């Protein structure tokens, strides 16, 4: 369009989507992932300067509890305005409510600055570890529906993520009560209340929705250690 997207440093190396996405998909094919029925969803924001591509793998479905299945999901992010590092992230997709479930393992995210030293091979090597990270996390999450959490702990977690935003705290509390009616006052209800907000809460500017969801997911990812503390203490 000729419209300026951003001003970046002299060492910045723009990696076109037309280059990085096919490379990433070749890495998926060459990995140990079962790609039967794979689904791809592409979203963009900020005038197409930021791109999120999510791959969902139905053949890697795990039941957390009866009639509650999660599927492996891997996302790749790329930007033309220098705002995002190139990254790939491991997550999961909850079939029951269509929530994107973020994974907090430090090895679940690969990041690399846009520069001449961008190492695509290292990124694809991280992709090969994705299945193990996913399996490990699902094993832990199977405890969540069985782990009761107190109202005080729930309030601490929601206050941590909401800060001074009373509307956000109210939204999280409302989500939690909805999930409690299905799963009881458990860690699973807390996690789903958080990911429900990240995935489904309205955004002011629909054109930037992909970026907003990413920022919300980062907040949820930062809070996951608090949930793990509750699980371990149970």
Where are these regions (language model features)?
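Generic, low-specificity signal for short hydrophobic/alpha-helical stretches with a mild N-terminal bias
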Residues: 2, 6, 37, 116-119, ...
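Sparse, context-dependent recognition of short Cys/His-centered cofactor- or disulfide-binding micro-motifs
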Residues: 5, 9, 40, 61
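Intrinsically disordered, low-complexity regions enriched in serine/threonine
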Residues: 58-234
């Amino acid at each position: 369009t000729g419209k300026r997207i951003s001003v970046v440093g002299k060492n910045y190396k723009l990696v076109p989507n037309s280059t990085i996405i096919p490379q990433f998909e070749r890495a998926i094919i060459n990995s140990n992932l079962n790609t039967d029925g794979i689904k791809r969803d592409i979203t963009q924001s900020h005038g197409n300067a930021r791109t999120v591509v999510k791959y969902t793998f139905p053949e890697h479905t795990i039941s957390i509890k009866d009639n509650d299945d999660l599927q492996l999901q891997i996302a790749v992010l790329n930007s033309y305005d220098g705002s995002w590092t190139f990254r790939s992230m491991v997550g999961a997709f909850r079939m029951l409510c269509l929530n994107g479930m973020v994974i907090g393992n430090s090895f679940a995210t690969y990041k690399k600055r846009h520069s001449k030293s961008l190492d695509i091979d290292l990124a694809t090597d991280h992709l090969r570890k994705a299945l193990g990270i996913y399996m490990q996390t699902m094993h832990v999450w199977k405890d969540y529906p069985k782990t009761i959490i107190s109202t005080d702990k729930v309030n601490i977690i929601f206050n941590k993520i909401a800060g001074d935003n009373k509307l956000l705290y109210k939204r999280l509390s409302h989500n939690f009560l909805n999930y409690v009616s299905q799963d009881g006052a458990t860690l699973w209800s807390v996690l789903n209340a958080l990911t429900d907000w990240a995935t489904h809460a309205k955004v002011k500017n629909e054109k930037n929705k992909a970026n907003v969801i990413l920022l919300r997911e980062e907040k949820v990812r930062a809070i996951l250690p608090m949930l793990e503390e509750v699980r371990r203490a149970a």
